[in-house]
Amino acid sequence: MEGGGERDHEAEPEYHCHDFEWEDLRADVEANPSFSHHLSPFPTTAASPSPSSEAWRSFHRRHASGRFFKERRYLLKEFPDLLNNNDVAKMLEVGCGNGSTVVPILRCSRNNIVYACDCSKDTLEKANEIVNNTEGLDGKDRFHPFLLDVSKETFPDWLFCKSCQMSNAKAVDLLLDSSEHNTRKEHPVLLKENQCCVGGIDAVTMRCVSVLKPGGLVLFRDYGLYDMTMLRFSPSQRVGFREYMRADGTFSYFFTLDTMRELFHAAGLLELELEYCCVRSINRKNGKSMQRVWVHGKFQKPTR
């Protein structure tokens, strides 16, 4: 595996996931009166702003001049499946940003091919620039970015493999149009209080599953309940149950294991791994300890 430039001298990335117990953090949060606004049900009659893709486009335009996000090289240790050295592996990243995930995936194996979508044209151009200009990467013909807002649009036909092009596409259309889906959207089991993220995340999940070949994997990592960033939000920033709006208009949702289990099981996937990743890090400027929480999940599409 070829490197380039200063990368030969970079420290080996570390991966931590059990620095503390999530249940201990939960007990501390729920016993702290200052966090009570995070725990109370969100009133269903409250008028909340609707999430806008334009907020993310503006975010990426503001950070287009530099590498706002560092390479997420730790993902190769969190998900060893990405370390593919034998067969050609085609991957899809939904919401690729500026390529901070794509670069280490392409670098770790010349057999990896990555398709990546985002709702921002500016950030796709930046990601393509970074991939093409990263020394020793040779990812020009292995990186295929395309513009798509997955919260509103279905994937293009050319992305579907032969084994799933007909059956999965039809299955998703039937699900999205069915009375069962309409009932779920109105009365979801675990998402009843929040409508999760931008609302309709169950439809987004099904769209992702629709382009996954039988036996393929969904690798998931996102904010987990009681992450440090969640606890910093004020009551006025709360726009839903476990959902908050930042000052720039972008939204953050904090997942639970039950939420993810329900979403992917409803989409027909098998649960292989699902846990909270609990990481304690130290702020080098002020020396304060930070407790970070992510949900780590790996799900597989059945072969039959």
Model-found features: residue ranges?
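N-terminal auxiliary segments of SAM/dcSAM-dependent transferases
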Residues: 1-50
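S-adenosyl-L-methionine
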Residues: 49-62, 66-70
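Conserved alpha-helix/loop element of class I SAM-dependent methyltransferases that forms part
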Residues: 66-90, 100, 104
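Class I SAM-dependent methyltransferase SAM/SAH-binding core
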Residues: 89-185
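A short glycine-rich, Lys/Arg-flanked "PGG" loop and its adjoining helix->strand segment in the class I
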Residues: 188-190, 202-214
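Conserved beta-strand signature within the Rossmann-like core of class I S-adenosyl-L-methionine
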Residues: 215-222
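C-terminal alpha-helical "lid/dimerization" subdomain adjacent to the S-adenosyl-L-methionine
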Residues: 224-286
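Core SAM-dependent methyltransferase catalytic element
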Residues: 280-304
